[in-house]
Amino acid sequence: MPIGVPSVPFRLPGSQYERWIDIYTRLSQERIIFLGQEVNDSIANRIVAFLLYLDSDDPSKPIYLYINSPGGSVTAGMAIYDTMQYIKAEVITICVGLAASMGAFLLASGAPGKRLALPHARIMIHQPMGGTGRRQATDIDIEAREILRIRQQLNEIMAQRTGQTVEKIAKDTDRDYFLSAAEAKEYGLIDKVIENSTMGNN
């Protein structure tokens, strides 16, 4: 049986009464966003909305983006990435579990010096995927060229974020490339491996 979204009690300031809200809404009130699924248009729209709201609420306070995601849509992920760069509030990224593909890209896109991972987290980078299906040859050619363009764009951003060369990023992402939290730090995907919440604030 699938587990539904858990609800938690919440008391409005100045009120003696509690009401139940879903845990993700409650976390957002603490400026915490949790990406815990495949990146698609629906989840991207939700995260973008949270980012925009929290930035407008107080751009001087950081936003915490926790990531445990296998990746997903490049266009949906880029919508989140662009919003992270657009807003004034810094976005601290924390990997719990797995940050793969677009999940790893978003992890590396956090505020400089504040891209974090828990000790047993795993990070995986690879090139963007594409499918041909049953389509005309000209359409397949168009998609292939677009995938190559996107791959180059992602490689350039990852090189800028990690300090690696574009050539090394291209070579390493040619196939699935897994890293431990410590290896991801050495690679430049994250800045620190943390064991408790206080370490992330230093």
Curated annotation (Swiss-Prot):
Compartment list: Cytoplasm
Keyword match Translocase: no
Catalysis performed (reactions): Hydrolysis of proteins to small peptides in the presence of ATP and magnesium. alpha-casein is the usual test substrate. In the absence of ATP, only oligopeptides shorter than five residues are hydrolyzed (such as succinyl-Leu-Tyr-|-NHMec, and Leu-Tyr-Leu-|-Tyr-Trp, in which cleavage of the -Tyr-|-Leu- and -Tyr-|-Trp bonds also occurs)
A GO term for molecular function: ATP-dependent peptidase activity
InterPro entries per UniProt: ClpP (IPR001907), ClpP/crotonase-like_dom_sf (IPR029045), ClpP/TepA (IPR023562), ClpP_His_AS (IPR033135), ClpP_Ser_AS (IPR018215)
Family matches, as Pfam families: CLP_protease
Alphabetical keyword list: Cytoplasm, Hydrolase, Protease, Serine protease
EC number: 3.4.21.92
PROSITE patterns: CLP_PROTEASE_HIS, CLP_PROTEASE_SER
Key word DNA-binding present: no
A cellular-component GO term for this protein: endopeptidase Clp complex
Superkingdom in the source lineage: Bacteria
Record Gene3D superfamilies: 2-enoyl-CoA Hydratase, Chain A, domain 1
GO biological process, alphabetically ordered: protein quality control for misfolded or incompletely synthesized proteins
Residues forming the catalytic site: S101 (nucleophile), H126
HAMAP family (alphabetical): ClpP
Protein purpose: Cleaves peptides in various proteins in a process that requires ATP hydrolysis. Has a chymotrypsin-like activity. Plays a major role in the degradation of misfolded proteins.
The protein's assembly and partners: Fourteen ClpP subunits assemble into 2 heptameric rings which stack back to back to give a disk-like structure with a central cavity, resembling the structure of eukaryotic proteasomes.
Family indicated by similarity: Belongs to the peptidase S14 family.
UniProt xrefs under PANTHER family: ATP-DEPENDENT CLP PROTEASE PROTEOLYTIC SUBUNIT
Name of the protein this chain belongs to: Probable ATP-dependent Clp protease proteolytic subunit 3
Name of encoding gene: clpP3
